[in-house]
Design a protein with these regions (language model features):
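N-terminal ligand-binding lobe of clamshell/alpha-beta domains
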Residues: 26-409
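Secretory targeting signatures
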Residues: 1-36
């Protein structure tokens, strides 16, 4: 008989206790939720590495961003939990211009897709007006269970780590937990590669982890499909492409438009997703460029982003103030394309693959000949927001993308 052996019952008890200890272990990765304690309190790790305690369910949320998180909550069926917004991005826009022959073109009912999907957002308090800080008195009065703050969004677009820490400390002094997302402008380099991480974190906060993961995989898949189709383009075959902002502010300042340099996410979409060449080799965003500079750049392809207004292709072709750009190669060869209407889109929202697809097909029409973007975008809205075809068409119109139907793009 082995006198050093443990009694069978005691040995089994020790094994069970060890198994329980190891099964309760957890790591502190971003977005991970720890089990609720006896009071139902959960914890998540946000994108700043902060551990945040949350109530078991979230009934009231204030969101300091520009529609990104609101879009996710619509997908989760939790849009009624939103009680306050971070900025005035829920407007219904109109844009018009006059042609050389006196014809007036007018575009109506342009809006953020989430504004269309959740019209009640227009009735909610806005905590950050243009040129002001957060209204903490209003925030406290809303009694939210959590504040979700997205760095890089217009609602929180400028400032240092010190400003962020002060903002978070002030909110937390009101006994309100804060979860921080880090959007592309505040990352080490501006890419969309961590948007999936943002989506998954929001999913954990609102207990919709599986659905959030499915969406992140879908969005990543759209970008990877573009990259796969253009990956083998030789350097000498890449078209020179320019995002040209037809901004009225640029014209008022003596320029002809705006450009985005190599250090911007706009350039990233051209060079690292579509695998084309940014014709503007400078740096900086919203850089005012003159008529002479644009003519010297002479890009092969031009895409027209939101720039203090919506800018259709016909504006560049027919507006009197752009007649001195008619000798551009892109204009003469009819290789000018309008991007979707995306006001307050500094940090990119869930629709970012639409921009990427328009840019990619504009650069390489032959490589995307099998994709009719005006149909593809309907599938996109259905997959992202779970809407029917009629609503998807309304969203396409809200982003002023019906030109794609008319052009067969």
């Amino acid at each position: 008989m082995n006198h050093n052996a443990l009694p069978t019952g005691l040995a089994l008890l020790i094994i069970c206790l060890l198994a329980l200890v190891f099964s309760c272990g957890c790591t502190g990765t971003v977005g991970e939720t720890t089990p609720a304690d006896s009071d139902g309190i959960r914890t998540v790790t946000d994108m700043r590495g902060r551990t945040v305690e949350l109530p078991p369910t979230i009934e009231r949320v204030v969101i300091l961003d520009d529609g990104f998180v609101e879009g996710l909550l619509y997908r989760f069926g939790m849009q009624d939990r939103i009680v306050g917004l971070g900025g005035a991005w829920t407007k219904d826009y109109t844009y018009s211009f006059e042609t050389t022959d006196g014809t007036t073109y007018e575009y109506k009912n342009g809006m953020n897709p989430v504004r269309y999907l959740i019209p009640g957002l227009t009735n909610l308090p806005v905590l950050v007006e243009s040129g002001t800080g957060i209204n903490y008195e209003t925030l406290a009065s809303l009694e939210p269970d959590v504040v979700v703050l997205r760095e890089g969004a217009w609602a929180f677009s400028a400032g240092s780590d010190e400003k962020l820490e002060k903002t978070v400390a002030t909110i937390e002094s009101l006994d309100i937990p804060v979860v921080i997302l880090v959007g592309p402008p505040f990352q080490e380099r501006p890419t969309v590669d961590r948007i999936g991480e943002e989506i998954r974190l929001v999913g954990e906060v609102f207990s919709h982890g599986e659905d959030a993961d499915a969406l992140a995989v879908y969005l990543d898949g759209q970008i990877e499909e573009i990259r796969k189709r253009t990956a083998d383009v030789p350097v000498d075959k890449k078209p020179r492409m320019m995002q040209l902002g037809l901004s009225p502010r640029a014209r008022q300042g003596g320029g002809a438009g705006m450009a985005w340099g190599s250090d911007t996410i706009e350039s990233y979409f051209i060079e690292e997703i579509a695998n084309a060449k940014n014709a503007y080799e400078g740096t900086g965003a919203f850089v005012v460029v003159s008529t002479e500079q644009i003519l010297v750049l002479d890009p092969d392809v031009i895409v027209l982003p939101t720039a203090q207004g919506y800018h259709p292709v016909s504006e560049l072709y027919t507006a009197p103030y752009y007649q001195n750009l008619q000798e551009l190669s892109a204009v003469k060869n009819h290789r000018v394309y309008a991007l979707p209407w995306t006001p307050y889109n500094w940090a990119k929202r869930l629709e970012y693959p639409i921009e990427a697809m328009v840019i990619a097909k504009a650069a390489y029409p032959d490589r995307f000949a099998d994709i009719q973007v005006h149909e593809w975008v309907l599938d996109f809205y259905r997959n992202v927001y779970g809407v029917d075809e009629a609503t998807a068409k309304e969203l396409r119109s809200a982003q002023w993308l019906d030109w794609m139907v008319e052009a067969g793009f």
